[in-house]
Amino acid sequence: MKPQLVIADDEADICRLIKFLLRSYDLSEAQNGKRALELIREVQPDLALLDVMMPEMTGLEVLDAVRGNPLTAPIPIILLSAKGQVAEIEQGLQSGATRYLVKPFEPLALRTCVAEVLQESHHQPVKE
């Protein structure tokens, strides 16, 4: 069975790129933080990728809600953001993100990061 991922980004082009790069996984998509949180609660994915700056709820707010719920707290979360200052990256990681990738990211870096996080969380990555 393919690992289930939730992808949340309000930029349609970024979502399309991520979906293309991670097409070997079972993907659910949200364009805002509120919907991302709903999907994470419904789907209980193996991994979530959240943009930091989204409407309705930021990625950090979604992260906080996920970590605050015992049912969703163990889900690995990769934050994606154009904000690449050291303080912002540290804030994301200290808030409970598993990883933090700065946009624009290299396609191979995203795929590698997802595979590593899934492997670390004891899910077998999908071979392409």
State each model region's role:
Residues K2-A12, I18, A48:
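Conserved acidic segment of CheY-like receiver
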Residues A12-S28:
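Two-component/phosphorelay signaling modules centered on CheY-like receiver
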Residues E29-L47:
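Acidic, metal-coordinating helix/loop segments flanking the phosphotransfer/catalytic sites
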Residues M54:
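Receiver (REC) domain active-site loop signature in two-component systems and cognate sites
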Residues F105-V114:
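C-terminal output helix
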